[in-house]
Amino acid sequence: MRVLVLGSGAKDHAIAWWFSQSRLINGLFVAPGNVGTESIATNLAIDPSDAKQVHEACTTNDIDFVFVGTEAPLFTGVIDYLNERGIDTFGAPNRALKLEGDRNFSRMFTDRHNIPTPTHVLFDDEHKLSEYLKRHEGERFVVKSNAIAPSRVMIDSSDYNSLMEFSKSILATSPIILEEHLKGLPITVTLFLDNKGYLSLPTCSDYMKSEEGGLPTGGMGSICPVPLQEEVSQALVDTIIEPTLFGLKAERMAYKGVLTISVIITNRGPILVDYHVRFNDPAAQAFVPLIKTDIVDILNAMKHDTLSSISLEVSTKSAVALVVASEGYPGKPIIGKVLDPMPASLMLNTFEGAPRYYFGGVQEKDGKLVTTGGRCVTVVGVGYNIMNANKNAYNGVKHVNFEGAWYRKDIGDRFFEN
């Protein structure tokens, strides 16, 4: 099999690395890729959101299968375009994209199928929003754009002025969803879907703020697996996963591909926060190093609707993923900073037990690695428990150095007692 992965972030580097470990592929391409993927695959300088360019690349390079890692190609119709032309690819078709791309649609879907979600209200008028907030003075809310937007585009606050100022900036282009603030443990549930069942990947817990109580980001770290009590795991299946899959089939939105569910474990039980129709970053960087099953075996099972028969082989170890970001992120990152040289052996991710390095906002320029975005490198430590994995991740981050680099110092801490 000859495979093309669409994307250029750290998540896509991790996915490409997973494919590179397969015994069943004889060609691996990434579009457009990055400095990390070029050592394990052939990077293709095309726009992954342009269906015609992707199709032409598949034809030119005899590509059999396309894996959509990043969200942009999903929302430009790449999957439907390729499937119509006989190229295998799995992922949410246009009819299912509203699960992620329209939060109000998603909330109505969960309401129809009795899936627990935060209390929520849709607003398209700032005056009505203002009146609502004044009636609930002092309460803490989360405000997000109704349309698809980066996860850092949100606010979690009890301050009227802050909530209104943020909401006005969104309402110019999209309605907003106002939700109750939930207290609890955030987890990320990742599923492969086919027409008859699903395969659950190791559950992660992501750190989405710049610091505890800080600004929202695209994700600053993740741990895997999450130590959940058996009754909580069963509640996830009974109240969220199974009703979601039933709803997808009932509403003719079922598809073969990835579904990621963001959940908060509260004292009321698991509550669904968001759906994503692709892998999440940085959860993917955390779970990929732990999975021993060949990804092509999983995809073949998906193709033949036999996912439920797959016994996923997962390491008994733990992983801690740590994101190194540019100064200024999550606001306006200061880019163009040169990374200190890294040993080639580390960049290749070839040594068992060594930290993994997955590259995001970094490009090679004049023989040097230069930052090009907010989140630059994800360092993943693997260890016999979360504490040991944490130690390995923070030892590994010492090799990622550039002016203004920063990262959270507490990834995994909340799980040490377990």
Residue ranges and their predicted role:
Residues 1-94:
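ATP-binding N-terminal substructure of ATP-dependent carboxylate-amine bond-forming enzymes
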Residues 4-5, 100-177, 195, 227-242:
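Active-site nucleotide/adenylate-binding loops and adjacent lid/helix of ATP-dependent enzymes
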Residues 12-13, 74-76, 129-130, 163, ...:
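Short, well-ordered alpha-helical microsegments
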Residues 38-40, 98-104, 211:
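Short, charged, surface-exposed secondary-structure boundary motifs
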Residues 153-287:
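Internal nucleotide-binding/catalytic subdomain
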Residues 237-259, 276-354, 364:
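Active-site "cap" helix and flanking loop/linker of ATP-utilizing ligase/carboxylase catalytic domains
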Residues 363-366, 370-418:
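Generic C-terminus detector
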